[in-house]
A protein has these predicted regions:
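Alpha-helical transmembrane segments of multi-pass membrane transport proteins
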Residues: 1-425
Length: 425
């Protein structure tokens, strides 16, 4: 049974069959032809995977992000970030990263950040003398902060699968997101020096910063509202998503008065497409995971890993490597839905903190989003600038290396993840 499930899935995947279809067909084949259970379980298990109140936050945060990006915040956000870091060598690259860090607190999606706010920087960066490869690389890698700094769609999925507090996960992602952003800025500085990019004119002054802060305060306030209301126990993550939607409509339509009815229809359509794809993958992955568990795959994985080592750090590194490798070939949501139910109990069994594990997995998944052959963010960024992944990837390697250094620091010092939770407690 295990051999069929794994071999049929990977054959379908490499033939180009969509991930949800590959998972579903492999699982259904096991049920129909190998006696893996009743056909009644197909619909039951798929519905069971999607039937989670916590997962309702996904379309809500997605819609809020689209409405904020369409409601006039993008240009104001760019100006605010430029007033802070634009004077540093490689200024536009730093603005790109800082904007992604702020937009991460709005959308919770790396791909949305790549195609949205970060995508707006690329033509301007090329016009100012940045190479296309550098421009695409910094845009793709900075967008991965979108799933680390709260709110985060992958964290919502993890919380729904493992029963972890979404609020604690959101708090755990704050320092790692900032750390990864600073690392990307350091790499951007030296790469800009190497490329001989002209330095932006002017120097840091407080006036433009205060003006930019006044213009962009509605966007800056949203992540504070979301994380604050959740961690204070006022609302659940899903209810906070409703607040984010109402606030996004209010900010774009009333405060900025730039959100049009066409923009709302676009945001709604994109939310339906994005959320529909995610939920279909979650349902199919749930069915596939149940079949793997029925076949004893989880016990085999646990026996193999614990037979190699019972040291928590070693097990943690092994789990992170598994997620990194798998995310290179599969969508992040499918990877989480498949492997979290299998690997999470192993991690708990050796004493790994669930918040530390979940945040580190989220960061690793972000690296997978910019790593070929299936890195979604790198392909979106390359399409926007009409370059190939092969051309961009060598420029991307230093950014990936910097992210792995950040991961190593977090593995060595998990307090970087847990500190906000301790402070709130």
């Amino acid at each position: 049974m295990i051999a069929w499930l794994l071999s049929s899935f990977f054959v379908l995947l490499f033939l180009g069959v969509p991930i949800a279809m590959s998972l579903g067909l492999s699982a259904i084949g096991g049920i129909l032809f190998l006696g893996g259970g009743s056909t009644v379980t197909i619909a039951q298990r798929m519905f069971e995977g999607m039937n989670s109140f916590a997962l309702l936050a996904i379309p809500l945060y997605t819609f809020a992000g689209f409405t904020m990006s369409k409601g006039g915040i993008s240009k104001r956000l760019m100006d605010f970030c430029y007033s802070i870091v634009g004077h540093i060598y490689g200024g536009l690259a730093h603005v790109n990263v800082l904007s992604s860090m702020i937009f991460a607190g709005i959308s919770g999606s790396a791909v949305a950040d790549t195609a949205g706010v970060s995508g707006m920087f690329m033509p301007e960066m090329v016009r100012k003398g940045y190479s296309k490869n550098f421009t695409v690389a910094v845009t793709a890698i900075s967008s991965t902060i979108g799933i680390i700094i709260p709110p985060s769609i992958p964290m919502v999925v993890i919380a729904g699968i493992c029963g972890i507090s979404t609020g604690k996960l959101f708090l755990g992602g704050i320092i790692p997101g900032i750390l990864c952003g600073l690392a990307q800025m350091i790499v951007s500085y030296f790469m800009a020096k190497k490329e001989g990019v002209p330095k932006e004119p002017g120097h840091f002054t407080i006036g433009p910063v205060l003006h930019g802060l006044w213009e962009s305060w509605p966007a800056l306030l949203m992540p504070i509202i979301i994380v604050g209301t959740i961690t204070m126990g006022i609302v659940s993550p899903t209810e906070a998503g409703v607040i984010a939607v109402v606030y996004g409509l209010f900010a774009g339509g009333i405060i900025y008065r730039e959100l049009k009815w066409e923009d709302i229809k676009f945001a709604f359509a994109e939310t339906v497409r994005t959320s529909g794809r995610i939920f279909i993958v979650i349902g199919a992955a749930k069915l596939y995971t149940v079949m793997l568990t029925t076949a004893g795959f989880d016990k085999w994985v646990a026996k193999t890993m614990l037979g190699f080592s019972t040291n928590p750090t070693v097990i943690l590194i092994m789990i992170l490597l598994i997620f990194f490798i798998v995310t290179m070939f599969m969508e992040s949501i499918a990877t989480l839905t498949l492997f979290m139910p299998i690997l999470y109990p192993i991690a708990l069994g050796v004493g790994i903190d669930p918040i530390v594990l979940s945040v580190l997995i989220t960061v690793v998944i972000g690296v997978g989003l910019v790593t070929p052959p299936v890195g979604m963010c790198i392909y979106v960024a390359c399409d926007l600038m009409d370059v190939t992944v092969g051309e961009v990837f060598p420029t991307l390697v230093p950014f990936i290396a910097a992210t792995f250094i950040c991961i190593a620091l977090m593995v060595a010092f998990p307090q970087l993840i847990l500190l906000p939770t301790y402070l709130m407690a």
